[in-house]
Amino acid sequence: MNIIDLGLIDFDEAYSIQERLAAEVFAGSGAETLLLLEHPPVYTIGSGGDEGNILDTAIEVRRINRGGDVTYHGPGQLVGYPVIDLARRGCDLHRYLRFIEELLMLVVADFRVAAFRSPGRTGVWTDQGKLASIGVGVRRWVTMHGFALNVTTDLTPFTRINPCGMAGCPVTSLEAEVGGNVKMIEVKARVGARFEGFLDEFMPLRDSEKDRGF
């Protein structure tokens, strides 16, 4: 498992890196990889999302091949793009989504934040609102895209969309939950330290692959 910190990187550039890594994983020539990064301000909308949920187009918009509706990415938000071979981990997308939720809940618990899943809604929540968004794309059982955890994010751009298609959805950040300064480098380190071991526990590698399909 490779864990790569890309720092602050343009969305399109990060997407190209994901595509290359996914092709290598599918071909068997590359390792599973977790990309950790931040984006300049951008709205992304899933393949089945409604552009009517974007109320202000002053920020760039990208329609992408993931599940979910519209969300915001910007500085202070930890974005994780795992490129994972689900064909070797049971071909269970729903369990993979639960893995990401559980991982993020463990990470924020390190900062004494009690987070939870909301029935029927993908993501990580607190009593104050949505703390992390999750949207995954899968092709031939190799994953792209992933999660966006609000750490020190300016939450104002969320007021100009219906986050994940939900009008009036409250959004929060780790900094707001803690009530003080949170360092991005510490959050990245905790995600990176937990990711591989927890994935292997949650979705162990298997010797054989199921039919990937297309």
Swiss-Prot record:
<dbReference type="InterPro" id="IPR000544">
    <property type="entry name" value="Octanoyltransferase"/>
</dbReference>
<keyword id="KW-0963">Cytoplasm</keyword>
<feature type="binding site">
    <location>
        <begin position="133"/>
        <end position="135"/>
    </location>
    <ligand>
        <name>substrate</name>
    </ligand>
</feature>
<comment type="pathway">
    <text>Protein modification; protein lipoylation via endogenous pathway; protein N(6)-(lipoyl)lysine from octanoyl-[acyl-carrier-protein]: step 1/2.</text>
</comment>
<dbReference type="GO" id="GO:0005737">
    <property type="term" value="C:cytoplasm"/>
</dbReference>
<comment type="similarity">
    <text>Belongs to the LipB family.</text>
</comment>
<feature type="binding site">
    <location>
        <begin position="66"/>
        <end position="73"/>
    </location>
    <ligand>
        <name>substrate</name>
    </ligand>
</feature>
<protein>
    <recommendedName>
        <fullName>Octanoyltransferase</fullName>
        <ecNumber>2.3.1.181</ecNumber>
    </recommendedName>
</protein>
<feature type="binding site">
    <location>
        <begin position="146"/>
        <end position="148"/>
    </location>
    <ligand>
        <name>substrate</name>
    </ligand>
</feature>
<dbReference type="GO" id="GO:0036211">
    <property type="term" value="P:protein modification process"/>
</dbReference>
<feature type="site" description="Lowers pKa of active site Cys">
    <location>
        <position position="130"/>
    </location>
</feature>
<feature type="active site" description="Acyl-thioester intermediate">
    <location>
        <position position="164"/>
    </location>
</feature>
<keyword id="KW-0808">Transferase</keyword>
<dbReference type="InterPro" id="IPR045864">
    <property type="entry name" value="aa-tRNA-synth_II/BPL/LPL"/>
</dbReference>
<dbReference type="InterPro" id="IPR004143">
    <property type="entry name" value="BPL_LPL_catalytic"/>
</dbReference>
<comment type="function">
    <text>Catalyzes the transfer of endogenously produced octanoic acid from octanoyl-acyl-carrier-protein onto the lipoyl domains of lipoate-dependent enzymes. Lipoyl-ACP can also act as a substrate although octanoyl-ACP is likely to be the physiological substrate.</text>
</comment>
<dbReference type="Pfam" id="PF21948">
    <property type="entry name" value="LplA-B_cat"/>
</dbReference>
<dbReference type="InterPro" id="IPR020605">
    <property type="entry name" value="Octanoyltransferase_CS"/>
</dbReference>
<keyword id="KW-0012">Acyltransferase</keyword>
<dbReference type="GO" id="GO:0033819">
    <property type="term" value="F:lipoyl(octanoyl) transferase activity"/>
</dbReference>
<feature type="domain" description="BPL/LPL catalytic">
    <location>
        <begin position="28"/>
        <end position="203"/>
    </location>
</feature>
